[in-house]
């Protein structure tokens, strides 16, 4: 993926589940600040979400779980979200991933 189109959206994967692949654009990868930004996006949202990176899948609503992925620059994270808020949260995630978490 290149340019401004760093999101591949497949809708739906299963009943009500969304899936997307995001490229990590910020040079420092997913460290504490971006992980915290991601988790805050889920505040008040009714959905379940997972991130998969290099074959490892974790709860996307947990800073520690996200950090354990060790996701680095130019890596791709597969996101799966299910629930009433899935579409809204996926859009928010697209915005922060595509902005490089404000580190570009």
Curated annotation (Swiss-Prot):
GO terms for biological process: phosphoenolpyruvate-dependent sugar phosphotransferase system. InterPro entries: HPr, HPr-like, HPr-like_sf, PTS_HPr_Ser_P_site. Residues 17-104 form the HPr domain. It holds the Pfam family PTS-HPr. Signal peptide: none annotated. The active site is at 31 (pros-phosphohistidine intermediate). Gene3D superfamilies: HPr-like. One of its GO terms (cellular component) is cytoplasm. Keywords: Cytoplasm, Phosphotransferase system, Sugar transport, Transport. It comes from the Bacteria. It is found in: Cytoplasm. SUPFAM superfamilies: HPr-like. Belongs to the HPr family. General (non sugar-specific) component of the phosphoenolpyruvate-dependent sugar phosphotransferase system (sugar PTS). This major carbohydrate active-transport system catalyzes the phosphorylation of incoming sugar substrates concomitantly with their translocation across the cell membrane. The phosphoryl group from phosphoenolpyruvate (PEP) is transferred to the phosphoryl carrier protein HPr by enzyme I. Phospho-HPr then transfers it to the PTS EIIA domain. PANTHER family: PHOSPHOCARRIER PROTEIN HPR, PHOSPHOCARRIER PROTEIN NPR. This is Phosphocarrier protein HPr. The gene is ptsH.
